[in-house]
Design a protein with these regions (language model features):
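Non-catalytic, surface-exposed connector residues within folded enzymatic/regulatory domains
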Residues: 1, 43-44
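DNA major-groove recognition helix of helix-turn-helix/homeodomain DNA-binding modules
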Residues: 44-60
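Short alpha-helical DNA-recognition segment
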Residues: 17-33
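Short basic helix-loop element that most often maps to the first helix and adjoining turn
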Residues: 7-20, 56
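A short, Lys/Arg-rich alpha-helix, primarily the initiator
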Residues: 1-12, 51
Length: 60
């Protein structure tokens, strides 16, 4: 699975839209949009950190 697909799946698992998700992580909306569209590549380390934060939030 490509990183952009993992990012989309992660966002959808939170129930947030693109704007909410990008604001939650402090990422400019345009950057996030480019990641999801595949125009730019999301750094893998950043995706893993976002996954970790989402997982920790669900546990609390």
């Amino acid at each position: 699975m490509e990183l952009k697909e993992e990012l989309i799946r992660l966002r959808e698992s939170t129930g947030m839209n693109k704007k909410q998700f990008s604001e939650y992580f402090g990422i400019p909306y345009r950057t996030f949009q480019d990641w999801e569209l595949g125009n730019r590549r999301v750094p893998e380390y950043l995706l893993r950190l976002m996954e970790y934060k989402v997982r920790m939030e669900k546990l609390n």
